[in-house]
Curated annotation (Swiss-Prot):
A lipid is attached at C23 (S-diacylglycerol cysteine). Residues 43-61 have a biased composition (Basic and acidic residues). GO terms for cellular component: plasma membrane. Keywords: Cell membrane, Lipoprotein, Membrane, Palmitate, Signal. It comes from Bacillus subtilis (strain 168). It is a lipid-anchor. It is found in: Cell membrane. This is Uncharacterized lipoprotein YdeJ. Residues 26-89 are annotated as: Disordered. Residues 32-42 have a biased composition (Polar residues). A lipid is attached at C23 (N-palmitoyl cysteine). Disulfide bonds: none annotated.
Length: 219
């Protein structure tokens, strides 16, 4: 009888130990599962953070890229406009001096139907009438424009560099000094200096100016 009780106690104790062991394993499993879930969440956060960071950097870079593209487009537009302006300007290949000579003749030249435009420079101090020793002298450098024929007339002027010129009413050909009384030439040439006119030069028609430049002869 005692032996049976002893066996019964042993079986009961063994059963309790098995039950306790099962409960312990269950608790360990439950504890491990949240830990695994937490690790998974942390892993997802690690993967998410670089993506968000990359997206932010990309968003920040976009305005800079657009700005650079705008600047490049503006530069290209400006360059195209400058090239078109040069193509449209038929006088771009000519010097400002030649353009000035042509503009002055186009505005003041007595005859526009000329086959040649002669340009001659006269220094200050040179006599207005080179054929008369009593002639007054030019007070400033002047330029004389004339056609190839006497009937074409002439224009004698000084460029002021501000869009205006001083015009001297000087004939292309003077009468012989023998035909003029002594002292008269002095009065005539001094009167030319005194009565010089200031004239504003118009820009004129580019095609007509180009034609005059093409037949220009500078001496």
């Amino acid at each position: 009888m005692k032996k049976r009780r002893k066996i019964c106690y042993c079986n009961t104790a063994l059963l309790l130990m098995i039950l306790l062991a099962g409960c312990t394993d269950s608790k360990d499993g439950e504890a491990q599962q949240p830990s695994n879930q937490a690790s998974a969440v942390q892993t997802d956060e690690k993967h998410t953070e670089p993506e968000e960071s990359t997206k932010i950097r990309k968003d920040e870079a976009e305005p800079i890229t657009e700005s650079e593209e705008s600047a490049t487009k503006a530069a290209n537009d400006t360059s195209s406009a400058e090239e078109k302006s040069k193509e449209d300007n038929v006088l771009a290949a000519y010097s400002s001096e030649k353009i000035e000579y042509a503009r002055v003749w186009l505005q003041l030249g007595p005859n526009q139907e000329i086959d040649e435009l002669n340009v001659r420079h006269i220094a200050a101090g040179e006599p207005i009438n080179p054929n008369d020793d009593t002639s007054a002298s030019y007070p400033e450098n002047v330029t004389q424009l004339a056609g190839s024929r006497l009937v074409d007339g002439s224009v004698t002027y000084h460029g002021n560099g501000d869009g205006t010129i001083h015009v001297y009413n000087v004939p292309l050909r003077w009468d012989s000094a023998d035909d003029i009384e002594k002292g008269v030439m002095r009065e005539v040439t001094e009167s030319i200096i005194k009565n010089r006119k200031t004239v504003y030069v118009d820009t004129g028609d580019d095609e007509k100016i180009k034609r005059l430049i093409d037949i220009m002869m500078i001496h």
